[in-house]
Amino acid sequence: KIDKFYLLKVYKKDNKFLLIKNTKFNFLKNLKIFPMNEIEKHSNLKKNLNFKISNMSMNITIQFNKIKGSIPNSSWIDSSKLDSYTLPSFTKKIFKYLKKNE
């Protein structure tokens, strides 16, 4: 298994979260995900989530950010209406985690 580390950026406005169309990673291609970057493993980073996707273990650190300007290929998703969106289970699990850890 490959261990990978990601910094997931959460932008929240009222009850809405910003998602982007994934064009960066080979997994979940063209689906709506939270903006994130692959990072080096740092011992001082707090790991919030771990996902196993095929042969990869994803260690995810969550960072809350203020929106500055516009982010390409993005849209605001109302977290109280998640069922009305077509989202990958990966994204839904992150929503569930955020709701539980508000």
Q: How should these model regions be labeled?
A:
Residues 1-102:
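Intrinsically disordered, low-complexity, charged terminal extensions of DNA damage-control enzymes
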